């Protein structure tokens, strides 16, 4: 998908017009096995890594934190939703972190999910080589997309035979919300974020839930001023990476979403915001229920008070 996303982004907005054209989309999707009822996320006309290179010197707030954040630019954030990466960057900078965004390869998860281990191993080796050159004692490797970041944490040790370099990297890996909870467990800095005026529902990503549970994302959201947070107690949203895109799985994917999420969402008594950090979860919720859900960093960034960051 990364090559597809790179080309799509380079050719935007033409590529987006093709994806919106029902006839052309059906023809293209028939060749690659995607159900024509699905919509591929629109391709951005710029990548997150390019935005970072062009704008990193514009955000020069006082550095208040000794931790250096190496922000992992996953494929969807980089080429489809750079705004999520930008929002994450702004939130971290506002909290006093030094943030760098390196040019990295795909995490390899798409190849792993299809059993293409040699290709996944090659990508893992390249990423570890790059990361090992820029990491130091004060660094953490932070991910925006749970599935991609947790591929490094959970799968790279087996792919790379538990070598010393990967062990050093693994000890530095965490999701962006986990970092903020770790460093601001007693509360966020005063007058940094506005109050939340709506109830916040959140849906946990399966990979995230299976490894760490949802307690930290709950704690993260509860750091926001005047917030009311409720977790959607459910199983998988039904997307499961590429599973829900595939023609033979589309119907069951939608059934799972409706079975696990419909009652919880439809029974809300008032206006609410829905947060889910997994891109596949957000796509499924949008497609099935017509609700635009947010990454947690989108929510945090929208509440920043400092005009220099908006």
Which residues does each predicted region cover?
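Iron-sulfur cluster-binding electron-transfer modules in prokaryotic oxidoreductases
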Residues: 1-310
